């Protein structure tokens, strides 16, 4: 790094690269183990070696008596995740716009969001459960569980919007106003399209955080489980590779969603990408705009703001 | 009745929190003229532009376009169009949609607005094949043409340009400034162009407005600003002048003689009302009217002669058509002479040479502006930058 | 969070309208539940029925039980160990990505590689360690096959070791992401200036990189500590029931409907977590640096 003069890399590069590789193995190794084991033969067990290769345990998931209500919990999880995604996107964008102004309770709302983020999930679930109990409302996935999950996804959404707006150049809004756009036209035709990669990032967070949420949901879910709760129940009851099959399936769904989100961000970025051999001054034109980093750094934005 | 594109600023003041950005400015920019607001960064020129455009509201005062007050009107209803610094082309729209943006906001059908956008692009001489490109895929010069046509498609009576050439390299800058001037002539509308580059302002503007610290120092034609600066500040900022200050000792036959701190004597023609004896005044002499005489002796002394400064050569810069010689004068400001290159080559100078600089009284011009201005330390201002800038020119 | 130039001078209701949905959700699903937990912690309990009254018995029982202190000590110990490990990992990985990977494309690609697991199920990622670390797991099988061990190592699974491994696996991303982000903002020129000034590689890290990435370090620390302190399922599954944490004990109480003692426990835990976060926020003014 520091010594960039020569072409050779310093020894620290190799040491750090080795560390990084080990870390990636550490991250993905166990996941690939259960991925492989989910294709265990019908007589195979919970550990290696593989006793044949089959889709038996995936089939077992759909036989309800064996491993609980997989289909029901899966569809509930998806429905809840889409609901959370929609609400997170809309509410986060609105809040992000609000925080561009100075207003009276900005600090209070900000700290409430941060507190909501670091509140132990089970405690929050307990509180939401108590609230519904006292109010005499039956907890359900679309009410209490939805609310409990929003306390987790909204702070993330807000933080991403902070990061996104901090890179947004207000001159685009002025240009739009100058060209006769009304306020909502400016928002719809200029601000939102320019921020689209960041908004897709918020959507990705909203979906996956909800789809995989467990500690906040466990108490307020009511009588019908979401998928992570079903898996949680299985960890104590089920001692067959069906558990791994479920893990593989749910991870596959996550990957599809991540891939879809990242691909769309990449496509938008590429559409706007500056030509490499462009005029050097072209770089200055929209350089303060966000396209270069907003989408790619979506993950980064989470912790960022 | 004022013509459509006439801009009148009446006692405009703008404060940002505690900072006074624009200080009681009044100015009339005639219809169909090319006006440059010129000054160092932070002098308030961009704020004025933004107030005309409606992106900023004046703290007090009135802005009139075509004789009608526009304060409080949204930008789009003022008949102005702005070309932003770095252009602010929408990164998510291609060239055609950028240009057609205003028409889209007004509900013009797609086919029609694209047709009109194409015509507009042709008018700024941007090749058709660029119309589907994204802004990031264009060079600086192409981006500027797109920005120009995006602004002009609104059929403005006033076009406001915020540092339009600063994102371009030197070659394009010269080319585009000529084109801006040509566009302005063709369209016959008012252009207001903000810049911090003296040569740019002088090259294009009918009316140059030199600003400093939120105030107008001088508003006049380029030639007048350059040859007859109103104040020591303008003389220094525009460059090309040596500023002389001193106390008036005699006034005789329309010529005042002054003595500066080192005892050197200068003469300047004065008009009525003439300054009084004992008054501190400033005058200036153009650099290309200063002659330099090389001395043999080691200790130069101007003696009792007027319009002579004695000193040693501090720097020699070859500038192509002339040679810029800077002379350190004891207990006084440096004197700069622009010598024709053949004259310089006839009697070459070296750094450290003892020289006498001399000029004729009729080449001296009395400065009327406030001598003590700028009031150092009273308001925040880039004093440092200004001084070094004026010395460089 | 700059105020818009044109709108700042006059009052506008826009921000209040815009922030209302967020504030509403937070008040209803975070504020009120939080207050309820505090209120219920003072309620009395008769077998399984909550009696709305005001008693301090939940707290006195909690604070007089030696088990409480053991649990809190254990939980804080987990939090500190995991914090230290994830901090080292987070810093090293970010440092590698930011300062050693030269191509921006590679940098982003490798960064995404680290963040993808964050978007998948924590429960799945946790249980994925079981077939690896178990008595007949892959690791033990390999060790025996290689002759490095003659019998399966028991400490690998259902132990503090496996709990910490799972925590680090789940939560190190929360450290990497913010540290990477603040490190990526360090101007290369600053580093080069330090090197030109004669700073060694080590001094560049201690004097330039660490101070300039302190926001990320603070945020990551807040995330990791809050997550470990609030965990119950990792410690339940990965310790095989042999260890416990504060929230795990609480979840047992909740399971048998002992809400008031659980709530009292929750209030104590929240106080401690808040204090820890406050200490971090005091060292680094996270908010100011975020909005700047």
For each feature predicted by the language model, list its residue ranges:
Chain B
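Conserved ABC transporter NBD signature motif
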Residues: 61-69
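Helix-to-loop junction immediately C-terminal to a conserved catalytic motif
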Residues: 53
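The feature captures the beta-strand-to-loop junction immediately N-terminal to the Walker
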Residues: 38-40
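Conserved coupling/switch loops of ABC nucleotide-binding domains, chiefly the family-specific signature
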Residues: 59-62, 112, 213, 245
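ABC ATPase nucleotide-binding domains
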Residues: 75-81, 85, 89-236
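Non-catalytic connector elements of ABC transporters
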Residues: 251-393
